[in-house]
């Protein structure tokens, strides 16, 4: 079983903890990581073009005038394409870019990404990460203590002081453990986790 040092907020070693090999020290399957990132980015896309056809335009269900006896050409609906305000015939529609990935593969991709960073010594575990007040300066001080840049901070539950302190720091993201995803893991150079977040991640990814 893999082990990792546990530090306090001042980077003083306070102990060690065992890590699940299945989650943090497994095989790195790069094709799964690539697939998961591709799915995430595709699902963020939204089509920006789209017009209403005659089925989508409101109103016009009633026949505008009777079929015969008026001397005009017969009409069935005032929302036909040749009417002003009618639907567009064969107009452009928004494309759906959504892709899917089954749950088992998504979990395996997250495990692979975590294992990759663990093997590259880019994971740091803290016993806790609580700030006494909202302080960007205090949070930046923690990052400098650990000598990390472009960092993903993973916590187990909402931490208002930490989240507000970090929100204006460039290349830093605070994420709750249940929202952990492959794209964020590979986007950042380093990951800082709390002990409780590690256990929460292991519980979610081992099941």
From Swiss-Prot:
Pfam families: Ribosomal_L4. One of its GO terms (molecular function) is structural constituent of ribosome. InterPro entries: Ribosomal_uL4, Ribosomal_uL4-like, Ribosomal_uL4_dom_sf. It comes from the Bacteria. The keyword Ligase does not apply. One of its GO terms (cellular component) is ribosome. Keywords: Ribonucleoprotein, Ribosomal protein, RNA-binding, rRNA-binding. One of its GO terms (biological process) is translation. Gene3D superfamilies: 3.40.1370.10. The keyword Mitochondrion does not apply. Transmembrane segments: none annotated. HAMAP family: Ribosomal_uL4_B (MF_01328_B). Part of the 50S ribosomal subunit. One of the primary rRNA binding proteins, this protein initially binds near the 5'-end of the 23S rRNA. It is important during the early stages of 50S assembly. It makes multiple contacts with different domains of the 23S rRNA in the assembled 50S subunit and ribosome. Forms part of the polypeptide exit tunnel. Belongs to the universal ribosomal protein uL4 family. This is Large ribosomal subunit protein uL4. The gene is rplD.
